[in-house]
């Protein structure tokens, strides 16, 4: 079996590439996916988001090694093992990232990936329902909507931010990210709008696109040229050959693992596992980054939260309404207000993100409070801690060693203390006076630096945004894995295009920029002239040097 292009992974970037590479009919595309079909309400119903990311059926089941700086805790790292990849199990929050994120990429060696370069690709991929005119796309495959924000707590959160002196941002994916405002969702007609729904399924209707179910074991190379992929399907091993190129889009965990199993990575590490060296790239598996967050939870004195919907009868009613009409509380992820703010004067653009939720509950669906409550998920966006993904053995079936080194940099602790105290300030504003009860978490007794640090150590959670393990950069950067056209340095006919190529993590959730990578990489792969650069200038707070708001 062979095709012009062989893509490993049907996730955010992989699905976008399958769609674009096959678009004009000139080239054939095979997409290799080990995961299951994305069918059923647990995947497609937005409110059911806590289920698929905790189910072996849909998730690769990765966890970090015990993390020494957070008390030896091992944090789960869900990655989608399903059509659509992690876009089929994520929280459906849509964030492009800040303009300065991409300018930093370009300045660090990823030339051609500045904000002016990537903004046209964000516009090409979007079908924005209500975003800022002129800054948003309206004809792309990816539907992006805003929630209804029926609950008064959503408006209280935005008003509280304004009362605290922060900006209001009506469209954080438009000209101005900084401020409090509505959150955007990849939901369409009441359904999760994953990369599979947006890109892969339309592509699979074309005669030149084929989906092959199989476990990718390694890249097949002839000398230093990639010519195919060895896959395992059942008990059968076979090779799918690529006439032009192999493109890895297997996630920030599996992409570096696959490179190393194929002889591309740190020479000493590969030798340790008896793998023949093809290209010594010490950056493969390094530069691992993530976002962490804590939940600040408050009791609500009025019975207006989602707590009323957590009983079995209400869940059944919500499920039936969604199954019949794709409406109601099942048709939203309930993240409908957000904020991006700066932590201190001298910080040029936001480095803290908020998700607001009108219930006190964990991501795994367990209620933290036995009564009405609300919460903010808050965390710093630019941690200085860095980790790694390395091989546990040369067995492709064995999960890799994942070490994030969470909270290993002292600045991360100071940033999180500020996040906790800032959230208390926001919840203390007059807008919350009609609703505010006692603080559930951390609790009013947690006040000193040491007490807050202990709370963070025990309760900090991953936001599930791993990236950076196949860093994009200049060809003379010894830690770069791919060049600015996503080509693996030192190997021909092989590219990586997913969140693993991010030089540095972006502001916010990663599904949006991952899809953008797939869109832009497609033009590089096809040898097209990139879309014309934008001349639109993003808003930067004129007070950034003297004030945090």
Swiss-Prot record:
Do you know which PANTHER family this protein is assigned to? CHOLINE DEHYDROGENASE, MITOCHONDRIAL (PTHR11552:SF147), GLUCOSE-METHANOL-CHOLINE GMC OXIDOREDUCTASE (PTHR11552)
Extract one GO molecular function annotation from the record: flavin adenine dinucleotide binding
Catalytic residues, chain numbering: 465 (proton acceptor)
Can you tell which superkingdom this protein's organism belongs to? Bacteria
Q: Which reaction does it catalyse?
A: choline + A = betaine aldehyde + AH2; betaine aldehyde + NAD(+) + H2O = glycine betaine + NADH + 2 H(+)
Q: Which Gene3D superfamilies match?
A: FAD/NAD(P)-binding domain, Glucose Oxidase, domain 3
Broad EC category = oxidoreductase
Task: Output the InterPro entries linked to this UniProt entry.
Answer: BetA, FAD/NAD-bd_sf, GMC_OxRdtase, GMC_OxRdtase_N, GMC_OxRtase_C
| Stored NCBIfam families | betA, PRK02106.1
Provide the cofactor list for this protein: FAD
SUPFAM superfamilies per UniProt: FAD-linked reductases, C-terminal domain (SSF54373), FAD/NAD(P)-binding domain (SSF51905)
Q: What does this protein do?
A: Involved in the biosynthesis of the osmoprotectant glycine betaine. Catalyzes the oxidation of choline to betaine aldehyde and betaine aldehyde to glycine betaine at the same rate.
UniProt-listed GO biological process terms: glycine betaine biosynthetic process from choline
Q: Is the Oxidoreductase keyword given for this protein?
A: yes
Any matching Pfam family? GMC_oxred_C
UniProt keyword terms in alphabetical order: FAD, Flavoprotein, NAD, Oxidoreductase
Instruction: Give the pathway.
Output: Amine and polyamine biosynthesis; betaine biosynthesis via choline pathway; betaine aldehyde from choline (cytochrome c reductase route): step 1/1
Quote the EC number. Answer: 1.1.99.1, 1.2.1.8
Protein family membership: Belongs to the GMC oxidoreductase family.
| Binding-site list for FAD | 4-33
Is Hydrolase one of the keywords UniProt gives this record?
no
Q: What is this protein called?
A: Oxygen-dependent choline dehydrogenase
Can you name the source organism? Answer: Brucella canis (strain ATCC 23365 / NCTC 10854 / RM-666)
